[in-house]
UniProtKB/Swiss-Prot annotation:
This is Fluoride-specific ion channel FluC 1. Fluoride-specific ion channel. Important for reducing fluoride concentration in the cell, thus reducing its toxicity. The keyword Transcription regulation does not apply. It holds the Pfam family CRCB. The keyword Membrane applies.
């Protein structure tokens, strides 16, 4: 089954993308649980400490899940989709960032860290500027 949006994407970019309902549902359900868990932790422990705790817990969880899967095959693909891409992915995106940084090695890892921090800060600044300038021009 291929949705129209994916057909358009395929014809424009030449990519073969298909919609897989079961796998998408696993990621979506896990994502729902992870985002609610993150919200609750940040309600209980507001400020940077809550975010720090969420990120560290997410890194521990993704490290356990992925490396347990790689070395011991302990989790099925569906479990990795539900837990990794869904639950942990929505709980924190920092866990994926940390895993990819370690796997990149020292040189590329440093570049990856610097680029993510710089681009992340620039993205927040640009988004903020769009809103601030838009509000002024829209008289909101």
């Amino acid at each position: 089954m291929c949705l129209n949006i994916f057909r358009t994407f395929k014809s424009y970019f030449g990519c073969n993308i298909t919609f897989v309902p079961k796998e998408s549902a696993l990621v979506g359900i896990g994502g729902c649980i992870g985002s609610v868990a993150r919200y609750q932790i940040n309600e209980w422990i507001p400020s940077l400490l809550g975010t720090f705790i969420v990120n560290v817990l997410g890194c521990i969880a993704i490290g356990f899940l992925m490396y347990e899967s790689i070395y011991f095959g302990a989790f099925s693909r569906n479990s990795r989709l539900f837990l990794g891409a869904g639950l942990i992915g929505s709980f924190t995106t920092f866990s994926a960032f940390a895993t990819q940084t370690i796997e990149a090695g020292l040189f590329y890892g440093i570049i990856f860290i610097a680029a993510n921090i710089l681009c992340g800060l620039m993205g927040v600044f640009i988004g903020r500027q769009i809103i601030l300038r838009g509000r002024r021009s829209w008289n909101i």
